[in-house]
Structure formats: structure tokens, C-alpha cells
Amino acid sequence: MSNLSNLRHKLQNGLIASCQPVPGSAMDTPEIVAAMACAALAGGAVGLRIEGISNIRAVRRATDAPIIGIIKRDLPDSEVRITPWLEDIDALSAAGADIIAFDVTCRERPVSVADLYQRARATGCLTMADASNIDDGLLAHHLGIDFIGTTLSGYTQAIVPTEPDLALVTQLAQAGCRVIAEGRYHSPALAAAAISAGAYAVTVGSAITRIEHICGWFCDAIKQCETEKLTEY
């Protein structure tokens, strides 16, 4: 089995932990990101999704587990944020990413999806498409991109849904894609549902690594209960 085939096999039917702290938060340091990554692996995660060069370097020093690397940028002339530039591809590979993920949505972008894919292939890394719908995913699949993620489903519109897009997982899987289900998988039951729907692997982020979000969910539920109690009187 080749190294790339072995890497694909490691992810199959597994959990990928996205260790991306809230920007500027108390957890937002490379050392803490690396610690979160190691803790996730100790809990059974088979891979990691890491943003930023310094974070990827820190995680790579701590583990040889598969890393999906991304760089997020806020561009003045494009809504594309995830790994938009060719130099990002080179930097991610040099930092130690095994898989390079990039936005494949049909939006104005500084570099074409095809060019990003070709540059990533040239580094020897595997590739992952962050798609928003079936058209994005199929375009990426036909280009030859290794993994198709549902990462951006619901995030290219004004109102973000609360539930994950399991229907998109099924559509892509039926089209022959290696689907990485990602986006709003906030419970073990939803992660299992993604595998049942045909996902190759499932990425979970906020529910594992964003303490602020998790605490917020509990606080909101408690406040809702308090409100309901008050309306009874």
C-alpha cells in the first residue's frame, strides 16, 4: 500500500477533530492547539484539521497523525476565505500538512480551483475540496480531488442552518466521492448519521474544541428553561 493510500485508509470511517480555537481567544496559541490535537487523538480521533502555519508546525511536532491544513484569509475582493492563494498551498505543505483543503465554491476568487488543485498535487499532498453544494462537489470530484467536504454547505447564504447537510453527504457519496462530512455535527448521533449516509469520515470542530461555543449552548438551554418557567406564572 502506498503512503497516500495508507493515509486515505487511516481516515476511513473515522473522526477528524478540527482544532480551531475562536480567533483571539484564550485558547488561540499554537501550544494549546497542539495540546487539543493530542487530546483529540487520545480520545480516538484519526485525523486533525488545523488552520494556520504556526499551528500546523506545532501540531506536526507533537504527532504524526494525518493533518488537513488550511489557511483562512479575509480578502477585500472575494468571499473565498479558505486557502485562496497558490502560496498558501506551498506554505501548508512545507509546514507539515498531509492533506491540503481549499474552497471550491463557484464564487469570485483570486485563483481557479483547477490551479489550486494542480499546485497541491505538485507538492505530493492529498487534496480536499471544501464544497457548499452538489455542483461544487461534483466539479471537484471530476477534477480528481481526493476528498470532498461538505464544509461550506449553509455558509454561503445569509441564514446558516442549525442542522448538518446529510442530504448532500448522501448525494456526493452516491456519485462516488470520498465525502468528509463537516459543518454543524454537534453530537455523536449526528456524526454516526453522517457515516450511515455514506460519509468516508466526519469532521467535528466546535463541539469538541471551542469551549466558548459549548458553554454557550448550555447557557442558552438554561436560559430557555428559565424563560419557560417564568411564563408559567
Curated annotation (Swiss-Prot):
Reaction equations catalysed: an N-acyl-D-glucosamine 6-phosphate = an N-acyl-D-mannosamine 6-phosphate
Pathway: Amino-sugar metabolism; N-acetylneuraminate degradation; D-fructose 6-phosphate from N-acetylneuraminate: step 3/5
EC number: 5.1.3.9
GO MF term set: N-acylglucosamine-6-phosphate 2-epimerase activity
Gene Ontology biological process terms in this record: carbohydrate metabolic process; N-acetylmannosamine catabolic process; N-acetylneuraminate catabolic process
CC annotations in GO: cytosol
Keyword Signal carried by entry: no
Keywords: Carbohydrate metabolism, Isomerase
Top-level taxon of the source organism: Bacteria
Annotated SUPFAM superfamilies: Ribulose-phoshate binding barrel
InterPro entries per UniProt: Aldolase_TIM, NanE, RibuloseP-bd_barrel
Enzyme class: isomerase
The protein's role, per its UniProt record: Converts N-acetylmannosamine-6-phosphate (ManNAc-6-P) to N-acetylglucosamine-6-phosphate (GlcNAc-6-P).
Homology family: Belongs to the NanE family.
Name of the protein: Putative N-acetylmannosamine-6-phosphate 2-epimerase
Organism: Yersinia pseudotuberculosis serotype O:1b (strain IP 31758)
Taxonomy of the source species: Bacteria, Pseudomonadati, Pseudomonadota, Gammaproteobacteria, Enterobacterales
Originating gene: nanE
